[in-house]
Amino acid sequence: IILAINSKNNFDDAIKVIRDHKYMILKENHFASIRINWNDKIQNIKEIAKEVNIGLDSIVFFDDDPRNCEIIKIALPEIMTINLPKDPSFYLPLIQSMNDFNTLKITNEDKKRGEIYHKQKQRVELKEKTDNLEEYLKKLETKVNIKNVDESTLSRISQLTMKTNQFNLTTKRYTEEKVRSMMNNSQMLIGGVQVEDKFGDSGITGTFIIKSENIEEWKIDTFLLSCRVIGREVEQAMMSCIVDKAKKEGVKRIIAEFISTKKNLPASNFLEKCGFKNKGKYWVFDLSKEFKRPASISIDIK
């Protein structure tokens, strides 16, 4: 769960309560985005979504003013809007009655989510101060660690397949049991992608699942990346690792499929950008060709 504040208020007065009130458990660093101003809440929500890089349909808006709730429902119907009762003592029972925040298991990334999105804000600020994308990527000093999936990480891999919508080539959903089954299959290769940079560790934010069709051909079953690291050439780094591994194994070609959904437009031209050729249903990469690694990223395969 990512926390954000969208409040019509005087910033100095409101932030003082957050910082100094003795009964305020949540502090400034617990919120991934803060909009305390006199702007309309519709615009604030759009800015929050852009800042933390999530879709509007992933947002739940809580407000104790029925008018604000009605405005958001009309203007942004994809958002779940909850009109809070006037008595704060009813807040907790209301939230506990909702199924939307239920989770079967908490991963390490879940525990660090607030910190991760606080660091994301610092990246946005750096990007705004940098003249061009190439310079920004250099300043980030991004490192990508590719790890074989094991019992300690399979929960996160399953979670990514269940939740990732935007940069996801096939949008296949896998339970932990299914990931474990594939992990123990000698014909399958599953990689967990950990991303870190000068601002900190973003955790495992991507995964790929490869099936060895035969000695000459690999098929990309799943290739996805969390929205918070999209646009930093991490996806190209992931693909370069797959290409390098395939070449070492003597594979001749890699085939992949893009299955279009309402939400995965950001991934629609990725295979073409990587040099895959469209062969009808599948895209094919000829491994006799070179694949250019991103110059701004260091890669460690473990």
PLM regions and their residue ranges:
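Acyl-donor binding region in acyl/amide transferases
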Residues: 195-198, 204-280
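Flexible loop/turn segments at secondary-structure boundaries
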Residues: 8-15, 42-44, 66-70, 89-90, ...
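Short amphipathic alpha-helix that is part of the acyltransferase structural core
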Residues: 141-173
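Conserved Lys-Pro-Asp/Glu-containing loop-to-beta segment of HAD-superfamily phosphomonoesterases
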Residues: 45-66, 72
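Short, high-confidence coil segments that cap the C-terminus of an alpha-helix
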Residues: 54-56, 187-188, 248-251
